[in-house]
């Protein structure tokens, strides 16, 4: 009686094949040009991948593969790197993709500006409370970076539009809930 041995390969080899088989970003569905591999929400670079020498058979890979995702570089940065608390960057990105006719490059520009601004405001120790009322571009004017100020103002106005749309949708959802005459 002969025992069948399943072929075992290093995890790094499975990942190389996985990387080449992915055609679209797992988050935004954009056609992939350059890929960021992510395991359980953490970016894994090519040096780390080359060190993954655990031997797996096909069944082991099928289980392991569920932990991995291929993202475009943009989504990798957004979803896996620390963001400031000033802006809902991921929600803003989704809004721009789904509710506007902007090209992916333009969406990327607005998101990058807002993320940089959030980091800048954090470094300046600006309080989140200052973002509550009024027009963001006017409220934050004293703290905007001196270069590309108009670009930051435009991004802030787009973000404020996103906030208004989000609030409107929340109000519409809550008003459509059933209510009782008793209360």
UniProtKB/Swiss-Prot annotation:
It comes from the Bacteria. Disulfide bonds: none annotated. One of its GO terms (molecular function) is sigma factor antagonist activity. Induction: Induced in early post-exponential phase, its expression decreases again at OD578 2-2.5. InterPro entries: Flagellar_regulator_FliZ, Integrase_SAM-like_N. During the post-exponential growth phase transiently interferes with RpoS (sigma S) activity without affecting expression of RpoS itself. It is probably not an anti-sigma factor as its overexpression is detrimental in rapidly growing cells where there is almost no sigma S factor. There is a strong overlap between Crl-activated genes and FliZ-down-regulated genes. FliZ acts as a timing device for expression of the genes for the adhesive curli fimbriae by indirectly decreasing expression of the curli regulator CsgD. NCBIfam families: FliZ. This is Regulator of sigma S factor FliZ. It comes from Escherichia coli (strain K12). The gene is fliZ.
């Amino acid at each position: 009686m002969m025992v069948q041995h399943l072929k075992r390969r290093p995890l790094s080899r499975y990942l190389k094949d996985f990387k080449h088989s992915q055609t679209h970003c797992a988050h935004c569905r954009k056609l992939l040009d350059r890929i960021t591999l992510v395991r359980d929400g953490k970016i894994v670079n090519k040096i780390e991948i080359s060190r993954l020498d655990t031997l797996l058979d096909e069944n082991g890979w099928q289980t392991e593969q569920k932990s991995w995702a291929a993202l475009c570089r943009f989504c990798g940065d957004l979803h896996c790197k620390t963001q400031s608390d000033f802006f809902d960057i991921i929600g803003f990105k989704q809004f721009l993709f789904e509710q506007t006719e902007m090209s992916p490059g333009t969406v990327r520009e607005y998101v990058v500006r807002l993320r940089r601004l959030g980091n800048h405001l954090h470094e300046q120790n600006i309080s989140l409370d200052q973002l509550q009322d009024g027009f963001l571009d006017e409220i934050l004017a004293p703290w905007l970076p001196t270069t590309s100020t108009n670009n930051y103002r435009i991004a802030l106005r787009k973000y404020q539009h996103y906030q208004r749309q989000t609030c409107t949708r929340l109000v519409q959802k809550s008003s459509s809930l059933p209510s009782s005459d008793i209360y």
